[in-house]
Curated annotation (Swiss-Prot):
GO terms for biological process: glutamate biosynthetic process; glutamine catabolic process. Keywords: Hydrolase. GO terms for molecular function: glutaminase activity. It catalyses: L-glutamine + H2O = L-glutamate + NH4(+). Substrate binds at residues 61, 113, 158, 165, 189, 240, 258. Gene3D superfamilies: DD-peptidase/beta-lactamase superfamily (3.40.710.10). It comes from the Bacteria. Homotetramer. It is an enzyme of class 3 (hydrolase). This is Glutaminase. Belongs to the glutaminase family. It comes from Fusobacterium nucleatum subsp. nucleatum (strain ATCC 25586 / DSM 15643 / BCRC 10681 / CIP 101130 / JCM 8532 / KCTC 2640 / LMG 13131 / VPI 4355). The gene is glsA. Its EC number is 3.5.1.2.
Length: 304
């Protein structure tokens, strides 16, 4: 397996030349465009890795699956999905268009920015510090990584430049989707996107979902139903507005982030973490997508 991963990383590294690192958030543009790495964690405890698997990066939108889990644990499935839908939007992740033009004013799903901001507003706590502290501790628990922390520079960059996110949040407040303090919800959201980890971190997160919400030590954190909800939304909405194409090409539940990460889940088998900050036009890791496509074909991982 290790040799296969090494071979696939080298084969697909050429695709990094065809994309670009995210540059609309200060600090993200400092990533090495040519970087590509992968980490695989199996349910029976084996670990395999190749390439730039140890490079730290901010998980960005991969955090949306973590905040969704915590929001459901805090409030229950019925409440969360009364505020946020489950349908693909077909629009870019930062689009505001359907919020106003759709007959239903709630965000289409929790994987687009508007939906994730609404989800962040549902995390329990007396203020944004307590809410984010709970979220970070929950992330450490399910990734089994106590070194997870906030990249403060990127958080400030997110907060200083996220004007479209501010506009979405205030619109959601006006529609009654966000019930609490708007700025607290945004602070939690910007901070969760700025959590820093490695390919191993998101590989372990993938393994947690592959094991239906059970940690390596056997402790159950999510119900089986909750784990299924998260994995289903990863398939239908996890790769932004190329989720359908990715499902056809790769066929495993995955969630990407503009920091270059992709967290993938092979149910009952393994979690996969990929890092490649050179992005395609949809905001997904370009070489990372090709790498996962090859790995899925080689190991027959497609769930369909």
């Amino acid at each position: 397996m290790k040799e296969l991963l090494k071979e696939l990383v080298e084969k697909n590294r050429k695709f990094t030349a065809d994309g670009n690192v995210a540059n609309y958030i200060p600090e993200l543009d400092k990533a090495d465009k040519n970087a590509l790495g992968i980490y695989v964690t199996t349910l029976d405890g084996q670990e395999f890795f190749a390439g730039d698997y140890n490079t730290k990066f901010t998980i960005q939108s991969i955090s949306k699956i973590i905040s969704l889990m915590l929001a459901i644990l805090d409030n229950g499935e019925e409440y969360v999905f009364s505020k946020v839908g489950m349908e693909p939007s077909g629009d870019p992740f930062n689009s505001i268009r359907k919020l106003e033009t759709s007959s239903r004013k709630k965000p289409y799903n929790p994987m687009i920015n508007a939906g994730a901001i609404a989800v962040a507003s549902m995390i329990k706590g007396k203020d944004d510090r307590e809410k984010f502290s709970r979220l970070l501790n929950f992330a450490k628990l399910i990734t089994e990584d106590d070194s997870l922390d906030l990249n403060y520079k990127i958080y400030i960059g997110e907060s200083d430049t996220g004007f479209r996110n501010y506009s979405m949040a205030y619109f959601l407040k006006g529609e009654g989707i966000i019930e609490g303090n708007v700025n607290e919800a945004l602070t939690v959201y910007f901070k969760q996107c700025s959590i820093e980890g490695t390919a191993k971190t998101i590989s372990t997160l993938g393994k947690f979902l592959a094991n239906d919400g059970v940690l390596s030590n056997g402790e159950r954190i999510l119900t089986t139903r909750m784990a299924k909800i998260i994995k289903t939304l990863m398939v239908t909405c996890g790769m932004y507005d190329s989720s359908g194409e990715f499902a056809v090409r790769v066929g495993i539940p995955s969630k990407s982030g503009v920091g270059g990460g992709i967290c993938s889940v092979v149910p009952g088998k393994m979690g996969i973490g990929v890092y490649g900050p050179s992005l395609d036009k949809k905001g997904n890791s370009l070489a990372g997508g090709h790498l996962l496509e090859d790995l899925s074909a080689e190991l027959s991982l497609n769930i369909f």
